[in-house]
Amino acid sequence: KIPNILKGGLKSICKHRKYLDKACAAI
């Protein structure tokens, strides 16, 4: 569903932006 590069990038963002926790959980 999500390209690995984008997925990895989102995970990195999740570590720094807690407000994305819900989006991160969906990954």
Swiss-Prot record:
The protein's name in its UniProt record: DELTA-pseudomyrmecitoxin-Pp1a subunit A
Keyword vocabulary terms for this entry: Disulfide bond, Secreted, Toxin
Chief place where the protein resides: secreted
Record's function text: This heterodimer has insecticidal and cytotoxic properties. Induces immediate paralysis when injected into blowflies (Lucilia cuprina), and then death within 24 hours. Also inhibits the growth of Aedes albopictus mosquito C6/36 cells.
Lineage summary: Eukaryota, Metazoa, Ecdysozoa, Arthropoda, Hexapoda
GO terms for MF: toxin activity
Claim: Metal-binding is one of the keywords in the record: no
GO annotation terms (biological process): cytolysis in another organism; defense response to insect; venom-mediated perturbation of biological process
Annotated compartments: Secreted
Other remarks on this protein: Electrospray ionization experiments give a mass of 6598.6 Da for DELTA-pseudomyrmecitoxin-Pp1a heterodimer (subunits A+B).
Transmembrane segments: none
Subunit comment: Heterodimer composed of subunit A and subunit B (DELTA-PSDTX-Pp1a); disulfide-linked.
GO CC annotation, single: extracellular region
Distribution of this protein across tissues and organs: Expressed by the venom gland.
